[in-house]
UniProtKB/Swiss-Prot annotation:
Gene behind the chain: ALG11
Assembly information from the UniProt record: Interacts with ALG1.
UniProt topological domain (Lumenal) ranges: 1-20
Effect on the protein of changing H406A: Almost no activity
Annotated metabolic or biological route of this protein: Protein modification; protein glycosylation
PANTHER family named among the record's database cross-references: GDP-MAN:MAN(3)GLCNAC(2)-PP-DOL ALPHA-1,2-MANNOSYLTRANSFERASE
Catalyzed reactions: an alpha-D-Man-(1->3)-[alpha-D-Man-(1->6)]-beta-D-Man-(1->4)-beta-D-GlcNAc-(1->4)-alpha-D-GlcNAc-diphospho-di-trans,poly-cis-dolichol + 2 GDP-alpha-D-mannose = an alpha-D-Man-(1->2)-alpha-D-Man-(1->2)-alpha-D-Man-(1->3)-[alpha-D-Man-(1->6)]-beta-D-Man-(1->4)-beta-D-GlcNAc-(1->4)-alpha-D-GlcNAc-diphospho-di-trans,poly-cis-dolichol + 2 GDP + 2 H(+)
Protein name: GDP-Man:Man(3)GlcNAc(2)-PP-Dol alpha-1,2-mannosyltransferase
Residue ranges within the lipid bilayer that do not cross it: 161-181, 407-427
Membrane spanning stretches: 21-41
Keyword set, alphabetical order: Endoplasmic reticulum, Glycosyltransferase, Membrane, Transferase, Transmembrane, Transmembrane helix
Amino acid sequence: MGSAWTNYNFEEVKSHFGFKKYVVSSLVLVYGLIKVLTWIFRQWVYSSLNPFSKKSSLLNRAVASCGEKNVKVFGFFHPYCNAGGGGEKVLWKAVDITLRKDAKNVIVIYSGDFVNGENVTPENILNNVKAKFDYDLDSDRIFFISLKLRYLVDSSTWKHFTLIGQAIGSMILAFESIIQCPPDIWIDTMGYPFSYPIIARFLRRIPIVTYTHYPIMSKDMLNKLFKMPKKGIKVYGKILYWKVFMLIYQSIGSKIDIVITNSTWTNNHIKQIWQSNTCKIIYPPCSTEKLVDWKQKFGTAKGERLNQAIVLAQFRPEKRHKLIIESFATFLKNLPDSVSPIKLIMAGSTRSKQDENYVKSLQDWSENVLKIPKHLISFEKNLPFDKIEILLNKSTFGVNAMWNEHFGIAVVEYMASGLIPIVHASAGPLLDIVTPWDANGNIGKAPPQWELQKKYFAKLEDDGETTGFFFKEPSDPDYNTTKDPLRYPNLSDLFLQITKLDYDCLRVMGARNQQYSLYKFSDLKFDKDWENFVLNPICKLLEEEERG
């Protein structure tokens, strides 16, 4: 990345606006004022409050329950810990391995799930963890701190200036957390980087760990803004707003002790933003052991897999269901009469009435406008996981069309179930998941995926390393009209190409995908990486500070 991206300076800002000393002096004044107020506030907290009262009570309970002295308090900052999504799975698996690592480890969860009249208790939350993720946790060593100000990090609270509003909200929420119970280690598993300066400047040194799912601002966002016609005070104001925000965001990296990301795409962006060469990737726990075990127990004999593709994705526009359906309709029109058509199953959850309306619009559009026969497409909403497992075990292909999805856990679930992934050639699916792999455990040591894909379809026989197929679309924001058409087909053409593959090719690739998913994305792999990249370094850091 060039200096235009990494080395933001006020000369650039002034060049946009013609400001001379005004912008610089104003920002310096604001920064100095914040520093002074922070110092005054810390002194007031130290002299007027007893922020360790809850911690003392908690430690007494922890010692009584686990029978260990000198416990270490790991504070997990996750205001929406009961949401039940992929981010929460990371949280609870990290909690699980942290507890199992050492009997002296105690967990504090900073959560806002106990307010706003919600009928939620710690027991409810841990029961949900068991039901949703099948993790049995030692509840005697898990404590919850209620955050009454969680609404300050909700995007609906900030109708305008959402980025800075949520940033300020996270700082306040971090202070509400730490003033009730300061931990020995602060771990943010949800992605609120503006909370780190509050933790770093508290009454004592607290190591900070971040597990980042995606950056809150990226080069892509800034490049998109810079390409806008620079006319009018509104555009100039947004440039200043985003540049100053990015400048502050960059400075936060110095506050963090351990930086963990969930994918190569996120890791590359975070390295560029925080100028850190120590970022580590820990892939989310995908429980591939359970899917592979289910497949082995209730396996699919030859001929039992159906000629169908499943789309496992929440019903939200960014998942690009419309693109998939439209491509499928084009595929059906171009399919020779002698070839059996694939059936398409759209399976996902809905969160609101808006999502329900979205599904209905897709159904109406596919039936009334695109004229897709009803027996070739179905929409399955909010299925329990056992029904999803059956669909995965019966299907042959799994489709994911999201552009620049930072990871893509559904794609991993496809592979663990022995499916052939058909995915968009970007971010997580391209860089991390559907990568070449052979029986010797070699990952990504082959030519680029698009070259392998061309060779695969040219020979129509298994090559021992391909794990899935890619497409790109002219509607992609970053579509290269010169290179991309030569490398990747569009989705409708890819549907046509996969109809040429015989059963043996698909069976061999599906079996390879299962072994690959165990090797790279299992819960056990997450446990090992969390121990190596987080727990062991933190223990060394705490020991050094005790000696120092």
